[in-house]
């Protein structure tokens, strides 16, 4: 599915809402901390389960925790400790947009993630 070249905001939004899951990973980018940015030479990476993030905007600003779940359909992440009480009195995760967090520690850097880092490092130079 090609990315639309239209300037119309409505068509841009339509693409975001109807994008297939394999393209939604690109929407899950979050900036890296200064230390990680210097170490890897990359400004942003897609958030994954197991990454440690610091929330920089919203109700839970300043909270740091590990990513418990990544929801590609809703384009939200769920961080340990960022919970609210629902109407039944149970704790549930508060959905956070990935652009509102900073990755402070990468969980697992496997072959696929290393490939992404190498590819993006070339683009930055």
From Swiss-Prot:
The keyword Ribonucleoprotein applies. Disulfide bonds: none annotated. PROSITE patterns: RIBOSOMAL_L24. GO terms for molecular function: rRNA binding; structural constituent of ribosome. CDD domains: KOW_RPL26. InterPro entries: KOW, Rib_uL2_dom2, Ribosomal_uL24_CS, Ribosomal_uL24_euk/arc, Ribosomal_uL24_KOW, Translation_prot_SH3-like_sf. Keywords: Ribonucleoprotein, Ribosomal protein, RNA-binding, rRNA-binding. It comes from the Archaea. It holds the Pfam family KOW. Gene3D superfamilies: 2.30.30.30. GO terms for biological process: translation. GO terms for cellular component: large ribosomal subunit. Belongs to the universal ribosomal protein uL24 family. NCBIfam families: rplX_A_E. HAMAP family: Ribosomal_uL24_A. Part of the 50S ribosomal subunit. One of two assembly initiator proteins, it binds directly to the 5'-end of the 23S rRNA, where it nucleates assembly of the 50S subunit. PANTHER family: 60S RIBOSOMAL PROTEIN L26 FAMILY MEMBER. This is Large ribosomal subunit protein uL24. The gene is rpl24.
